[in-house]
From Swiss-Prot:
The HXXXXD motif is essential for acyltransferase activity and may constitute the binding site for the phosphate moiety of the glycerol-3-phosphate. The keyword RNA-binding does not apply. This is Glycerol-3-phosphate acyltransferase. The keyword Magnesium does not apply.
Length: 827
């Protein structure tokens, strides 16, 4: 056999060249990865993709990216390796076939536009689907991934495209150079190719459809991340001035004040300048850097729950309205920071006009704040301009945030909602907008609120200090260890769905020009507001501080041994874990001992050591302040506390009688604390709590009766103390009603507060909300709604006395005597 040496040499050369070429991409990626590792610091969304998205790493995973970018691919690779996900550069071997683990949907633009490589995504999709046809056990998880460098939405005039368009190589280089530290990798829920193959087949048309759906997915995801383009401020004002509603309000202003039309129009422009935000992406980026640095030093962690449901709504095109509870001025910054890091657009925020002082006002305005006055009364032009501005935000697709409580809670409990802005939100729907508006209730919790000392002073009568630069600097100078922060997203409320269910003919009120107030608007808004408050509380977060404060404040001397405190925290934790307040509420996974150690680091408690062990003390000067944190989770424990109080008082009681007692008091508790259960749900909840209390050994169940267990009576008494002050307040009001059935509501509220203040002094009650005007006002309204007070103002003596007698059994005899003697003394 003859051998051709030139042929052999050619074969060796070809093999070497092929080997070199096959290794070249690896060398190329290594070289490219060197500058990227320095320039790019990306963030994964969600923070831990595999468990949060339910990815099964034991099954094949492939990644789908929107367009061909090696920088994006290597950024994705870094995040995959950091989270123990398969390396996208490693091919996927299936039944002896090697396939790339990543797919680019679009080839992407090039510097030289005439050169466009052949798009291979459809072929790859078809190859993957075809493997599923031949292998019935195969199930590849297709994970869409977006890699974004920067998130500036751009302006309506100026830039032709926002910076997140598909970039060619040169553009991508500068994007990485300038925005590498402001990048994120967004993992989406996986799509099962097995399900696709089984339900839709495996031919090429399905592959084409899959690629088309993926393109739509990425387009929506980009819009959810960057938001719509921003208008030039003057163009926005011109559009508002041209609206019929503002034009009419300007005419009315000129006529009523006897000024020229130009002067009235100038007044409207001044109001727009006062109200409107001046959103700046560069300010968002700068503030994000500052806050990231600050949070890492002040907070030990920011815990975010249920953000995926919000990302999905944004992806589906919903107009998002964030409705958080209001604990602190920190809420504005914290929520925007969290949303930004969840891959969502920071919202336009309705901020109180009191924050519009230099330099905070201009900064907040560039971060998306628009300012709202405390009242609209007597200024029709202002109310019209504000309503039209809010409607314009909705029509343009911007997310919005406002605090439905109207102001910061001074007690740690939710305030009764203020419905003005919510009403305007529904009026915006009645203008005939096409995008669905969805309200997102949000629970914000802290282990330290910097204003809590000021709140206590204000509740005791001090004048509220006006916000200013010196006050802000004093507050910032006091910031130390703030512990943990909590942002829990509650159950969304799609307004269209709500109106369809409760006001079926609401579309008949749509008017694209004029703001309308149909007869159903006010009661519907009130119901929505109340529902929102319930949903906010449903997303409550228990933490080390509020649990320890609850236990120590339940003790008469505000002190417990470490063993007693541990036992009490275990009681709370087991109740919350085994009978959850709601599916949206969160409970620490740490042990009671670990929570105590963490709380002690906050320097709110004192520890006395002796030969027996540690005694943990809540100092008297701190007790008033710590009620704030206890009140954050009062709603989560009030029902088991009430049950414990009833069982403790009676020593043994049948389930039916217990249910009767709870049923009498529950409407007041529900209204005050925005509890989630309806009356018909109570029997099941009480049964579940009773079974859990039996499991803990707090009570025994004998012949359908609940008996106190003497061995754990202290734990049961401390649990019961959580309802103690609430029951005392109810006793005050019901005694006053019984003693004077014809008392008017205003006098009833005033006298209730007077007796409560007296009780607070004589019996050392440290809770400022004990005699809070708003609490008694809400209670009296509930009594009217429940029929204890008639429309004419008179009470029903027999019913009120019956309830008072029930309450009198649940409070101590000395407190009862103080209540009764106080009213007798006044008489």
């Amino acid at each position: 056999m003859t051998f051709c040496y030139p042929c052999r040499a050619f074969a060796l050369l070809t093999r070497g060249f092929t080997s070199f070429m096959s290794g070249w991409p690896r060398i190329y990626y290594k070289l490219l990865n060197l500058p990227l590792s320095i320039l790019v610091k990306s963030k994964s969304i969600p923070a831990d993709p595999a468990p949060e998205l339910g990815l099964d790493t034991s099954r094949p995973i492939m990644y789908v990216l929107p367009y061909n970018s090696k920088a994006d691919l290597l950024t994705l690779r870094a995040q995959c390796l950091a989270h123990d996900l398969p390396d996208p550069l490693e091919p996927l071997e299936i039944d002896g076939t090697l396939l790339p683990r990543y797919v680019f949907i679009h080839g992407g633009p090039r510097v030289f536009t005439y050169y466009t490589p052949k798009e291979e995504s459809i072929k790859l999709f078809h190859d993957y689907l075809d493997l599923h046809r031949s292998n019935p056990n195969l199930d590849v998880q297709m994970v869409p991934v977006s890699v974004m460098f920067g998130r500036a939405p751009g302006r309506e005039k100026g830039e032709v495209n926002p910076p997140l368009r598909m970039l060619n190589g040169v553009q991508k280089f500068f994007a990485v150079l300038w925005l590498g530290r402001d990048s994120f990798v967004r993992f989406s829920p996986s799509v099962s190719l097995r399900r696709m193959a089984d339900e839709h087949g495996t031919d090429k048309t399905i592959a084409q459809k899959l690629a088309r759906v993926a393109r739509m997915h990425f387009a929506r995801q980009r819009l959810a991340a960057v938001g719509p383009r921003l208008p030039a401020r003057q163009d926005l004002f011109n559009k508002l001035l041209a609206s019929r509603a503002i034009a009419k309000a300007v005419e009315d202003e000129a006529r009523s004040k006897k000024i020229s039309h130009e002067k009235a129009q100038q007044n409207a422009i001044v109001l727009m300048e006062e109200i409107a935000a001046n959103f700046s992406y560069e300010m968002i980026r700068l503030t994000d850097r500052i806050l990231g640095f600050t949070w890492n030093r002040l907070y030990q962690g920011i815990n975010v729950h249920n953000a995926e449901r919000v990302r999905q709504l944004a992806h589906d095109g919903h107009e998002l309205v964030y409705v958080p509870c209001h604990r602190s001025h920190m809420d504005y910054l914290l929520l925007s920071y969290v949303l930004y890091h969840q891959g969502l657009v920071p919202p336009h925020i309705a901020a109180g006009i009191n924050l519009n002082f230099w330099p905070a006002g201009p900064i907040f305005r560039r971060l998306g704040a628009f300012f709202i006055r405390r009242t609209f009364k007597g200024n029709k032009l202002y109310s019209t301009v504000f309503r039209e501005y809010l409607g314009e935000l909705f029509s343009r697709g911007y997310s919005v945030e406002y605090f439905v409580e109207g102001g910061r809670s001074r007690t740690g409990r939710l305030l009764d909602p203020k419905t003005g802005t919510l009403s305007m939100t529904i009026q915006a729907m009645l203008r005939g907008g096409t995008r669905p508006i969805t309200l997102i209730p949000i629970y914000i919790g802290y282990e330290h609120v910097m204003e809590v000392g000021t709140y206590a002073k204000e509740l005791r009568g001090a004048t509220k200090e006006k916000e200013s630069l010196p006050q802000m600097l004093r507050g910032l100078s006091k910031l130390r260890n703030l512990g943990q922060g909590y942002v829990n997203f509650g159950e969304p409320m799609p307004l269209m769905t709500y109106l369809n269910q409760h006001v079926p003919d609401w579309r008949e009120s749509i008017d694209p020009i004029e703001a309308v107030r149909p007869a159903w608007l006010t009661p519907t808004v009130n119901n929505i507001a109340a529902d929102l408050m319930v949903r906010i509380n449903n997303a409550g977060a228990a933490n080390a501080m509020n649990l320890c404060c609850t236990a120590l404040l339940a003790s008469r001397q505000r002190s417990l041994t470490r063993e007693q405190l541990t036992e009490q925290l275990n009681c709370y934790l087991d109740l919350m874990r085994n009978v959850p307040y709601s599916t949206d509420s969160t409970v620490p996974s740490a042990s009671a001992s670990e929570l105590i150690d963490h709380a002690l680091q906050m320097n709110k408690f004192e520890v006395e050591k002796d030969t027996i062990g540690d005694i943990i003390i809540l100092p008297r000067e701190q007790a008033v302040l710590m009620t704030y944190y206890r009140n954050n989770i009062a709603h989560m424990l009030v029902l088991p506390s009430l049950m414990a109080a009833i069982v403790t008082q009676h020593r043994h009681i049948s389930r039916d009688v217990l249910m009767e007692h709870v049923n009498v008091l529950y409407p007041m508790l529900k209204a005050e604390l925005f509890l989630r259960w309806d009356r018909d749900e109570l029997p099941d909840v009480i049964d579940a709590l009773a079974n859990e209390m039996q499991r803990q050994g707090l009570i025994t169940l004998q012949d359908d009766e609940l008996h106190i267990n003497p061995a754990h009576s202290r734990t049961l008494q401390l649990l019961a103390a959580g309802a103690r002050e609430t029951l005392q307040r109810y006793a005050i009001t019901f005694w006053l009603l019984s003693a004077n059935p014809s008392i008017n509501r205003g006098t009833l509220e005033k006298e209730s507060r007077t007796v409560a203040q007296r009780l607070s002094v004589l019996h050392g009650i440290n809770a400022p909300e004990f005699f809070d005007k708003a609490v008694f006002s809400s209670l009296v309204l509930t009594l009217r709604d429940e029929g204890y007070i008639s429309d004419s103002g008179d009470a029903e003596p027999a019913e009120t006395m019956k309830v008072y007698q029930l309450l009198a059994e649940l409070i101590t005899s000395d407190v009862r005597l103080t209540i009764e003697s106080a009213t007798q003394g006044e008489g």
